C-alpha cells in the first residue's frame, strides 16, 4: 500500500492472523496503525493483547455478527470445495453445509477410491484410496486409511448427520461493558458486510445504547429487544468467557440468518404460499429454505400481508419448494428506517464532491535473487525412530515444534528443520518462545515460520546468525513478489508460496522473487483449522459432504485440523 502511494492509516484484518502478543510489536515495525483481533480470543486474552500493544497501534475486536468455524487466514475449505478462495473474500461457505458421519460412510469412501484408481487418478483423491485399499475395510474395529502421521482412520460408527461446522452468530450484547476502558482497544466491530440496512441499523443502535448506558438495566433491556429484531442467526458467546467456553454450533438446528415467519403450503394449482406468523410489509425480503437446498431462493414481499393471511410466492417452477419448507424474513424496510435512509441520502448529495488524483508514485522495484538450490523438506507428523534420526543427504527432515518433539536427543536436533504451527494463541506464546530458545541452544538453525509475526519469538542475535535459515512457511499465504520483499526485510531467508496459487503464478513468481522459493509438493494439506473444537463429529473418523467428498478431523494442541481424505500431490507437474 505504501509503495502504491497510499499515506493513510493501515489496518491489519483478522486474515493477517495476529493471534499472539509478540505479533503486535512486529506489526508496529512494519508500519501498521490498527489491528483487528481474532474472534477466538477470550476477554482475558484480549487484555493480554492490550497489555502487549505498543504505542501508536490501536485495536479492534468483534462484538457481533457471523462467525467462521475456521481460524481467519487459515481456511482453505472454499478453495477445495468451490475453487474460490476465502482468503480473497470469495468464500462459498462449505462450513454451512450438512455433513454425515458413520454408517456406510467409510465403505462409500473406499468405493470412491477404487473407482478413482480404475479411472487412472493416481494423483489426487486416488492417492488416499490406494492407501485405504490396503486396509481390511469390512472387519469391525480395524483401522482403515492413513492419516499421514502413523495413525489410521477408524471405520464408521453410528450414523449421524448435521451442520457440524455452521456457526451461530457472535453476540456480546450486555458483556460489551467488560470491553470498555481496555487500553488501545478503540473500536468495536460488527460483522455484516452483506446485510441490509435493517440489520445494520438495529445492531448499531443496540450497541450504541449499551456503550452509552453500561449500568442502566432499562437500557440493557431495550438493547436486547432491539438485537432480537435484527434478523440475525441464533447467537453465541463462543470463547469470550474463559470459564464458559462453548462450541458455537448447533448441528441439529438452523444456522441461517433471518426470522422464521412461516412454512410453505402448496395450493391446488401447485403454487407455493405462506400464512405468515407476523404481518409482512411491502419491500420485506424473504428467504425460502437454506443455502444448500435445491429450492433455496430469496424474493421481496410486494404487498401488505396480515398475520395469518395468504401470500402467494412467485418462485420459478424449477425451484418450487416442497410443503413444510421454512421461510425467513431476512430484511425489512420500516417506514421510519426508510425515512432515515432518505435523510442520509439527501445529506450525502449535498456534500461537495472530492476531487481525485492519479497516483504518481511507482512501486519500488523488486530485485530478483540469484538462483539458489535449497534442500527439499519432508515434514514428519510423528517423532522419528531409529534410522529416521540420521541426517539425510537428499532432503531435510523436519518436525513440528512441540514439547514432545523438542525432547528428542540433543545430539540429533541440529539434523532437523523445525516448523512452527500456523496459529499460536496468547496462552501458548511463552511456551513456544521457550521451545525455540531450547532448540537453538541445542544446535537447531533451520526454522520454518508459518506466520510472519513469529519472528517476534526470536532474538535479534538469532535472526542475524549467518548460519541460520528462516523460511516463511506455506501458511503465510505468499502470493506476490512485494510480499516476499517485505519478508526479506523482516529477516527471512527463503519462502514457501501459498498452495492456492494457479499454475501460471507458480511458474512466474520465482522469476521475480527476491528470495529463494519453495512450494508444497505433496502431502496431507488441511482445508482448515479451528479453535472451537467439534460438537458431534468424532475425531479420526471420516465424514462426508452432500456430494460425498470425504474428510476427517484431528486435534493438535488447542486446534482441530480438518483434512480431505485425499492427499495433495503435484509431483507429476
PLM region descriptions:
Residues 1-22, 36-187, 194-486, 490-573:
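Active-site pocket-lining/capping segments in soluble small-molecule metabolic enzymes
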Residues 33:
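Long, basic N-terminal domains or extensions that often function
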